Amino acid sequence: MSKINKLEHIRNIGICAHIDAGKTTTTERILYYTGKSHKIGEVHEGGATMDWMEQEQERGITITSAATTCRWQDKIINIIDTPGHVDFTIEVERSLRVLDGAVAVFDGVAGVEPQSETVWRQADKYNVPRMCFVNKMDRMGADFYRCVEMIKDRLGAKPLVIQLPVGIEESFKGIIDLVKMKAVIWKDESLGAEYFEEDIPADMKDKAEEYRAKLLDMVVELDDAIMEKYLSGEEVTEEEIKRLIRRGTISAAFYPVLCGSAFKNKGVQPLLDAVVDFLPSPIDIGIVKGMEVSTGEEKDFPISITEPFSALAFKIMNDPFVGSLTFIRIYSGKITSGSTVINTVKNKREKIGRMLLMHANNREDVKEASAGDIVALAGLKDTTTGDTLSDMDKQVILERMEFPEPVIELAVEPKSTADQEKMGLALSRLAAEDPSFRVSTDHETGQTVIKGMGELHLEIIIDRMRREFKVEANIGAPQVAYRETITKACEIDYTHKKQSGGAGQFARVKIIFEPLKEVKDLKDEDKNKTFVFESKIVGGAVPKEYIPGVEKGLNNIRETGVIAGYPMIDFKATLVDGAFHDVDSSVLAFEIAAKAAFREGMPKGNPKLLEPIMKVEVITPDEYMGDIIGDLNSRRGQIQSMDPRGNAQVVTANVPLAEMFGYVNTLRSLSQGRAQFSMIFSHYDQVPSQVADIIKAKK
């Protein structure tokens, strides 16, 4: 990390795209030409350097963002490889959070595909400046100009064409650089390492002039002095054009569009030049939002090497050689191995051991890293994704990443007792790596339940459990967590007596059960509870020491409701009277009496079955609105709102979780894969009686 590691020399970029647009191949070529990779890895042979997990090599899709450092000209480029499959959008969100700029790769044949829209919208959310690389220009049916139109129409973005392709499909051999007004042609025999500049071919002169004029019209708008010069017929210099393209890219006034064929090794070096010339350095971003721990005040912190140390942990990975690795993006200050920092989210100290610069699957030890760097730390104890590491004296919490709630759950059981312990360890490791994956235990069945972002997501988790941790497990079908409640108040007076020889048992309880929403004087601390117990015993009708027995009995018994055995929620139990016996009463006797009172009382409270209702948000192009709303209505959904966002529509609806299984596939087919959805738990609501009858029958 020599002195070229100045902030303006760093580019932290992501390469994001739809699955199969050629993103991994593009990254591979970048590594090859920047001298980090000695052999070109081909994805379709399962050998790419970036795709280093076994499943990725088999499926040919990128799952884990591996962070790689390489150099071009005198700049350091940190590349975060992002997955392109919809079930891994969490990985994309996570990497976009720590990037300064991105290259969106499009398939020259397919154009803007559905996942490209999703990733583009996520990049909008984090205000990531980006440029577009239209790839696969050598393929049959590739059409650069159609692709540019799709960027405009489908993404609602403003493309700035800075290159044109020379030759089409098989005869694609280079590009026209509209800034220099030169053609750049590659020599096939040198694996794309050698290329030369020449004059623009005569048959492309007119097109080049037309697009050059469009380019100038767009960029001069950013600078009044240059605009005047341009309008008065003076020549705008190459330097001025580059400076304006950079300014417009960083402010998202437009998105430069380049083209090439990564697989055929054409167009990669100009893409690297453009990354260096047009994408922002950490200095251009300038600030990071956060909170000062001492004051609790939200403020903007400068990105600078001279400020106190702060970094965001954005990825945790299990490395077969080093163990657990925490990838961090350093926003300010510097860090040395051996120093101690604080995790401000958990308020725990962390000692920095090994610090690694990662190159896909190779690693290089470093002793010091500073603002702008992306490094991996080995052996952190308490840090998880989204945590902030900070200087001990000036503590900050950087803006936390928001992770969507998982939308699908499955029960898993280990196949043998030997697998039991291994499975617990495997699942907790995987959950630490991936915040969109959750593990819990079902109180009713004792089963382990795993939750994730989609079927492919959970499939891959189960696959990793088998491969990396050697755990064999049986997988159940997706389930819904129903609940029960009462809808009217009732009062029960119950006496528990057992006096046949030896020590007897005696307890009398009088309990009022009522729905929580009907309780008038509910205390503030009880407002978010699903069960409230209160004792109004006066004059010692039930001695103080027996009252916890009543509460414990009710708490245990409410886990199995009276309709279909689901937990009872949203009710209050008030102990108003009772009686005891000097010899035969005990805590246990009152516990038994409370349970019996519950069983007797609940059927009188007009019990109802409840189901989880999800808040579903669907983002769709206009033309599919009708079908999507019709489908949501058929799922017992209630439409809450419809709003335009960019050139898409956002439909918000409340839909029962039970009706949402398999929705991702329905939505894909209704919208040709162009709509996307997210859902989070909203509330519990009563199940319609005809549906409740079916659920009871299944129990």
Swiss-Prot record:
GO terms for cellular component: cytoplasm. The keyword Transferase does not apply. GTP binds at residues 17-24, 81-85, 135-138. InterPro entries: EF-G-like_DII, EFG_II, EFG_III, EFG_III/V, EFG_IV, EFG_V, EFG_V-like, G_TR_CS. Residues 8-283 form the tr-type G domain. SUPFAM superfamilies: EF-G C-terminal domain-like, P-loop containing nucleoside triphosphate hydrolases, Ribosomal protein S5 domain 2-like, Translation proteins. Disulfide bonds: none annotated. Pfam families: EF-G_D2, EFG_C, EFG_III, EFG_IV, GTP_EFTU. It is found in: Cytoplasm. Catalyzes the GTP-dependent ribosomal translocation step during translation elongation. During this step, the ribosome changes from the pre-translocational (PRE) to the post-translocational (POST) state as the newly formed A-site-bound peptidyl-tRNA and P-site-bound deacylated tRNA move to the P and E sites, respectively. Catalyzes the coordinated movement of the two tRNA molecules, the mRNA and conformational changes in the ribosome. HAMAP family: EF_G_EF_2_B. This is Elongation factor G. It comes from Rickettsia felis (strain ATCC VR-1525 / URRWXCal2). The lineage of its organism: Bacteria, Pseudomonadati, Pseudomonadota, Alphaproteobacteria, Rickettsiales. The gene is fusA.
